[in-house]
Regions:
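Positively charged n-region of N-terminal signal peptides that target proteins for export
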Residues: 1-4
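Bacterial N-terminal signal peptides
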Residues: 7-17
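N-terminal signal peptide c-region/cleavage motif recognized by signal peptidases
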Residues: 19-21
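Ser/Thr/Pro/Gly-rich, low-complexity intrinsically disordered stalk/linker tracts of secreted
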Residues: 24-1006
C-alpha cells in the first residue's frame, strides 16, 4: 500500500526576539486551528465554519498564534513541525512545480500556486525607532520541485510589508510521511528571527491550502489539490510542535470530525495472476487491488474513492501453501522489521518471500516497489507477512497474516486497519525463486479458479467483494508410480541387520495415502529385545528412548526441492490385531514452520509365512491446512540387537502395496538377498516321550510328546521329517473326523479332528505361540489324513505316510527361528496313534531328518522315553522314602530307600529338571547301593537314556534297595530353594523284567 502525501504549508514566519537577549524558554501556542473550510471562507484562529464532507476537496485551514518576543522568559521559534491528520492528503500533480531557484527569486508561475498565507508580525526595528510595530503580511504557497528523498515540498512566500519596509520572505518546507499512520508532517527549521537590524516576531499565521478551483479564476489548479479523510467514526487529529532556539519544545493539538461518509464511493476491482498456470506446480502468484483514481460527482459534490481499511483476500481451495517454502526460510522479527521506524527494514535476505508494486496519484507515472518478508508465526497463524514499500519519499510498513481452512486448505490473506492513503493499484506478489521454494503451489485439477477480495472501506460502507479468476492448465493424466527401495549395510544371513526402507512418489503423481511394505520371511525384528511403548503414549508422542528402534526422514511438497523433516521410530505394543507397532514421530519444527510433532502409527502384522507386513495408518494429507504431498518416506531400523537377516540366501524381495488418495493402488518391489549362509550352524535336537499308564501294551493308544530345540542364531528349519518308533501306527477308525483347508484357515476345525496341542517358542516374539494339532483331509481319496499345527497366526501343514514306520513330514517351514517346539498328541481310546506291540519290551527310537533354509541338513536317531511301563506303584506295593540335602551350598546329597512287594533286581532313577549327573566316573566311584540293608558292591551303575541305572549281578535279588549319592555325584542345573519340593521318578526292575514306577517328592534341605 502507499502512503499519501499531504500538501502541507508550514506557516513559518520571519521570527523572534532580540539577538543575544532571549532566554532558553519555550514558545507558547494558542488558538490552533486545523480543519477544512468552505471555499471563500476565512482562515484564521477564528475561522469560518467547518465544512468537512468525507472524501471531498475543500480548502484546508491551518492557523495558530505564537507568543514570542524579547521579554523575560521568551525565546524565538527555531523549528515548527505541523502534523496533519491521517487521511488529509494533497496531490502534488494538481499544480505545476516551481523550481527552488525560481522560488527564491520570486519567479514562480501562478500555475504552481496551491494556497495562500497571511501572518501578523511585530517588528522592532530602527526605522520605527525600535517601537514595536504590528503589521499583517500576506503571500502565496507554491508547489516546489522536491529534493532527493522527499515526497513533496512547499514554498511559502511572504510579500513586502508596510509598503516595502520589509523585504519578501521565502520559506521552504519539505514534507515527510509519518511511518506510524502515513500522515504528513511539514518541517521548517532554522527560522529567521531578525529583520532590518532589529527583531521580528510572529504573532499569528493562517495558511490556506486549496481544495479545488471551483470557479475561482485566480486559481490555476489542474485538478483538486486537497482531499479530506473518508473516516467518520473518529476525530481527525492535528498536532503542532514548536521548538525554540533554546531547545525547548511546546506542542498543541486540535481535531475535526468528517461527515457524510455515506456519500463516499467505493468501487474497487481485483486482478489475479498469472492468468494461466500449470497444474500441481509451485510458482509465482499475485493479486492486484484496484481503486479508481477519478472522482465521483462534480464541483462541491465531487468525492474521492474511500480509503481501503481492511482486505480479506480469499484464495480458492487447491491453491495452497507450498511446504518447501520453509527450506532455508527464517522469520524476520518485529524488531528487525522496525514497525514505525523511518528506516529500511533490517530483515535478513533469507526472510524475503515476495514483493509489492504500489501506484499512487502522488507520483504520476511511477510505480513504487517494496518487499514482502516472512514474519514471526503465531499460534494458529503459520504465515505472517511484513510488507515494506521501500521508497525514501514514501515509506510504508504494513503487517498482514493468512489463515488456512484446515479442511479445504484454502488460504485467506488478511490486511487490517491500513492507513488512509490513496492508491490506484496495489499489487502483492509471492515470488518464485526458481528452486521450488515458491510460497504457493497450484491446484492439481485443471479449470478456472476464482479469487475474491472482501474489501472494507474506512467510510463504514458495505464490504465490496470483487472477484477474478485464473486458469490451471497442463494437467497430466492421473499417474501413480510409487517407488520402493531397501538397503542394508550388512546382509550376513542370520546376523544383525540395519534396514532402511525407502518409499518414493514422483512429483505430479497421485497423492500417497497409505502403504504396506511386506518384508520377506526371516528379515524381521526381535520384539522381546526392546520394551514396547504403550499405544496411547505413542499416539501422544510420549514414548521414551527405551523404545526407540530407528529414525525417519519424510519429505513433502511439490516441485524440485521438497521439504525434508526428521523423525524417530519407536516400537509399540500391538493394536488392531497386530503383534506390535511402529510409531513414526516426525518433527515439523524448522525455522519457518512449527506444526508440532506428528505421529503416524504403523501396524506390524504377522503373515502365515511368518513374514512381517508393515501397514501404515492413513497418512495425514494436511497439517493445519498445509498440504503434505509425500515425496519420500525413509525409515531406518537400526537398534542394536533388534533386526536380523533371513537365514535363507535365496533372493526374496520386499513387496510394497500403495494406495493413493481416491483409491488407486500400485505395487513395487525392492530386491533383498542374504549372504553367507554357509557360515550358519544348524544343530536341532529332538526328544520324545511316548506312553502312559495303561497305554503301552499292544493295541493301546499311547500319548506322544515330541520336543525339538535349537540354539539361537542358527539357520532356521525349512523341512523336518520325523519317523516314529516301529510298532506305532494309526488307528483308522479314529481318523474319521478331519479338518479342511478352509476350516483351518478360518480357525474352525471340527472338535473331533483335534488330536493334540502344540507350543512354539521363538526369540522373535515376547510370548510362546500355542494351539491345536488337527487331522487334515487327505490329499486324495483313500490317502492318510495330514496333520496341521494351528498356532493362530501361523499354521503348519504336514503329510503323513505309513511304511515300516509312521513318517510325518513338514515341508516349507517359514524362515523363522524356533528355539523350542513341543508337540503333544493325546492318548486314550480315541487317539490317532495305536501300538502293534508292547512298548516296554524294546527301546523305541525316533528318526529325525532336518533341512535348513541355509541349505545345511542334519539327522539324528533318538531313544524315546517310554512312560507307563510295568504295573502301578500302588498295585505293586512300591514304597519310597528319601532325603535331599546340601542345596544351599549347591552340593546336593540324595538318599533313597525303595521297598517293593515284588522281588527287584535293579533300579532306575529319573532326576528332576533342577539336577543333573556330575559325571559317570563319580557316579560309579561314589554311588552306594544296599540290598536288603547290606552294601552291595557288584552293582552295575551307569547313565542311560536320561536315567541313573543300578543293576545287580546275575542272580541277586531283593525287595528292598537303598541308594546313596554323596556330594559330587549330582550337580544343580539351576538354583533350588531350600524347602521346595523336587520330584524324582523311580523305576523298579522286577526279576521278570517288568518295570514298577512311582514318583516321590522330596523336600530340599540345606
Amino acid at each position: 500500500m502507499g502512503r499519501w502525501i499531504v500538501a502541507m504549508a508550514a506557516a513559518c514566519c520571519g521570527l523572534l526576539g532580540v539577538a543575544g537577549t532571549a532566554s532558553a524558554a519555550s514558545v507558547p501556542i494558542s488558538g490552533l486551528v486545523s480543519k477544512p473550510i468552505a471555499q471563500g471562507g476565512t482562515c484564521s484562529t477564528s475561522p469560518s465554519a467547518t465544512d468537512a464532507p468525507a472524501g471531498a476537496h475543500r480548502d484546508y485551514c491551518v492557523a495558530f498564534n505564537l507568543d514570542t518576543g524579547s521579554g523575560a522568559g521568551q525565546d524565538d521559534a527555531k523549528k515548527i513541525t505541523i502534523g496533519l491528520p491521517g487521511g488529509v492528503v494533497g496531490d502534488p500533480g494538481a499544480a505545476a512545480k516551481c523550481t527552488q531557484a525560481d522560488f527564491e527569486a520570486g519567479n514562480c508561475a501562478d500555475t504552481a500556486q496551491v494556497g495562500t498565507v497571511s501572518s501578523t508580525v511585530t517588528v522592532v526595528v530602527p526605522i520605527f525607532l525600535f517601537i514595536p510595530t504590528q503589521m499583517t503580511v500576506t503571500g502565496e504557497v507554491y508547489n516546489l520541485q522536491t529534493s532527493p528523498g522527499e515526497p513533496a515540498r512547499l514554498g511559502i512566500s511572504l510579500d513586502q510589508g508596510l509598503a516595502g519596509a520589509l523585504s519578501p520572505v521565502h520559506l521552504q518546507s519539505p514534507i515527510r510521511v509519518r511511518v506510524a499512520d502515513a500522515g504528513l508532517d511539514s518541517v521548517t527549521d532554522n527560522l529567521p528571527k531578525t529583520a532590518l537590524g532589529g527583531s521580528l516576531h510572529v504573532d499569528s499565521m493562517a495558511l490556506t491550502l486549496w481544495g479545488w478551483n471551483q470557479g475561482d479564476s485566480s486559481r490555476k489548479l489542474a485538478k483538486p489539490f486537497m482531499t479530506l479523510p473518508t473516516r467518520c467514526d473518529a476525530d481527525a487529529v492535528s498536532n503542532i510542535t514548536v521548538t525554540s532556539y533554546g531547545g525547548q519544545s511546546t506542542s498543541a493539538s486540535t481535531s475535526f470530525r468528517p461527515t457524510a461518509c455515506d456519500k463516499v464511493p467505493f468501487t474497487p476491482s481485483l486482478e489475479v495472476g498469472p492468468t494461466t498456470t500449470p497444474a500441481d506446480t509451485p510458482g509465482e502468484a499475485w493479486a492486484k487491488l484496484i481503486v479508481p483514481g477519478t472522482d465521483t460527482g462534480t464541483g462541491a459534490n465531487a468525492r474521492r474513492q474511500a480509503y481501503l481499511k481492511d482486505v480479506d483476500l480469499k484464495l480458492p481451495a487447491g491453491l495452497a501453501l507450498n511446504a518447501p517454502l520453509a527450506n532455508g526460510l527464517v522469520p524476520c522479527t518485529p524488531e528487525q522489521f522496525g514497525f514505525g521506524e523511518d528506516a529500511p527494514p533490517r530483515c535478513p535476505a533469507n526472510t524475503e518471500m515476495g514483493r509489492v508494486e504500489f501506484v499512487t496519484p502522488i507520483f504520476p507515472g511511477e510505480t513504487l516497489t517494496g518487499k514482502v518478508y516472512f514474519g514471526e508465526p503465531r499460534p494458529g497463524v503459520p504465515l505472517v507477512n511484513y510488507i515494506s514499500v521501500e521508497d525514501p519519499r514514501l515509506r510504508l510498513k504494513l503487517g498482514g497474516y493468512a489463515t488456512i481452512d484446515p479442511e479445504t486448505t484454502a488460504i485467506t490473506a488478511h490486511f487490517t486497519d491500513q492507513p488512509q492513503v490513496p492508491f490506484t493499484s496495489f499489487r502483492f506478489i509471492y515470488t518464485d525463486p526458481g528452486d521450488g521454494r515458491a510460497t504457493l503451489t497450484s491446484p492439481v485439477g485443471c479449470g478456472d479458479y476464482s479469487v475474491t477480495a472482501d474489501m472494507r472501506p474506512w467510510n463504514g460502507g458495505a464490504v465490496q467483494s470483487p472477484t477474478n479468476a485464473f486458469k490451471v492448465i497442463d494437467c497430466v493424466p492421473p499417474t501413480f508410480q510409487p517407488e520402493l527401495g531397501a538397503s542394508l549395510p550388512d546382509t550376513q544371513a542370520g546376523g544383525p541387520a540395519a534396514l532402511t526402507v525407502h518409499i518414493g512418489r514422483p512429483d505430479k503423481n497421485l497423492r500417497l495415502e497409505s502403504a504396506k511394505v511386506s518384508l520377506p520371511p526371516g528379515l524381521t525384528g526381535r520384539l522381546p529385545a526392546v520394551p514396547a511403548c504403550d499405544v496411547a503414549a505413542a499416539r501422544a508422542n510420549q514414548c521414551s528412548d527405551a523404545s526407540l528402534v530407528g529414525s525417519a526422514k519424510v519429505s513433502v511438497g511439490t516441485g524440485p526441492a521438497p521439504l525434508s523433516l526428521p523423525g524417530k521410530v519407536y516400537l509399540t505394543k500391538g493394536f488392531d490385531g497386530a503383534i506390535a507397532g511402529l510409531a513414526v514421530a516426525v518433527n515439523t519444527k524448522v525455522p519457518a514452520l512449527d506444526l508440532g510433532t506428528v505421529v503416524v502409527m504403523n501396524k506390524l502384522m504377522l503373515r502365515p509365512d511368518t513374514g512381517i507386513d508393515v501397514q501404515t495408518e492413513a497418512l495425514p494429507q494436511k497439517l493445519e491446512g498445509i498440504p503434505t504431498p509425500y515425496r519420500s518416506i525413509d525409515l531406518t531400523i537400526d537398534r542394536a540387537g533388534f533386526m536380523q537377516n533371513a537365514t535363507s540366501c535365496a533372493a526374496n524381495p520386499l513387496h510394497g502395496t500403495f494406495t493413493a488418495v481416491g483409491g488407486t493402488t500400485a505395487n513395487a518391489d525392492a530386491p533383498y538377498q542374504a549372504t553367507g549362509c554357509d557360515k550358519l550352524a544348524f544343530t536341532p535336537k529332538l526328544k520324545a516321550t511316548i506312553g502312559s499308564a495303561g497305554q503301552v501294551a499292544a493295541n493301546s493308544h499311547p500319548p506322544l510328546t515330541v520336543t525339538i530345540e535349537q540354539p539361537d542364531h542358527q539357520a532356521a528349519q525349512q523341512r523336518t521329517v520325523v519317523s516314529l518308533p516301529a510298532g506305532i501306527g494309526v488307528d483308522l477308525k479314529n481318523l474319521s473326523s478331519v479338518c479342511t483347508d478352509a476350516q483351518l484357515n478360518a480357525g474352525a476345525c471340527p472338535a473331533g479332528s483335534k488330536i493334540g496341542t502344540v507350543t512354539a517358542q521363538t526369540p522373535l516374539l515376547p510370548a510362546a505361540l500355542s494351539g491345536g494339532v488337527y487331522l487334515m483331509q487327505g490329499a486324495k481319496l483313500g490317502a492318510l489324513p495330514g496333520i496341521a499345527l494351528d498356532l493362530g497366526i501361523i499354521r503348519l501343514k504336514g503329510s503323513v505316510a505309513l511304511g515300516q514306520r509312521l513318517v510325518t513330514t513338514f515341508d516349507g517351514i517359514p524362515d523363522v527361528p524356533l528355539s523350542k517346539l513341543v508337540l503333544n498328541l493325546t492318548g486314550g481310546p480315541k487317539a490317532a496313534l495305536k501300538t502293534s506291540k508292547n512298548l516296554c519290551t524294546q527301546t523305541p527310537t525316533v528318526l529325525a531328518e532336518y533341512a535348513s533354509h541355509s541349505g545345511k541338513t542334519a539327522k539324528e536317531t533318538v531313544n524315546a522315553l517310554v512312560s507307563g511301563c510295568g504295573v502301578s506303584a500302588k498295585s505293586a506295593g512300591l514304597a519310597i522314602k528319601g532325603k535331599l540335602s546340601g542345596v544351599k551350598k549347591k552340593r546336593p546329597v540324595l538318599s533313597l530307600t525303595v521297598t517293593s512287594a515284588q522281588t527287584l533286581k535293579g533300579l532306575r532313577l529319573k532326576l528332576p529338571s533342577t539336577l543333573k549327573l556330575g559325571s559317570s566316573k563319580t557316579l560309579k566311584r561314589a554311588g552306594r547301593v544296599y540290598l536288603g540293608g547290606k552294601r552291595y558292591k557288584k552293582t552295575t551303575v551307569k547313565w542311560s537314556r536320561g536315567k541313573i541305572s543300578f543293576t545287580a549281578a546275575k542272580g541277586a535279588k531283593t525287595k528292598k534297595l537303598q541308594i546313596t549319592l554323596p556330594r559330587g555325584v549330582l550337580r544343580m542345573k539351576k538354583a533350588i530353594k531350600v524347602g521346595s519340593k523336587q520330584t524324582f521318578t523311580v523305576y523298579g526292575v522286577t526279576t521278570s523284567g517288568k518295570l514298577v514306577s512311582a514318583k516321590v517328592r522330596l523336600k530340599a534341605g540345606k
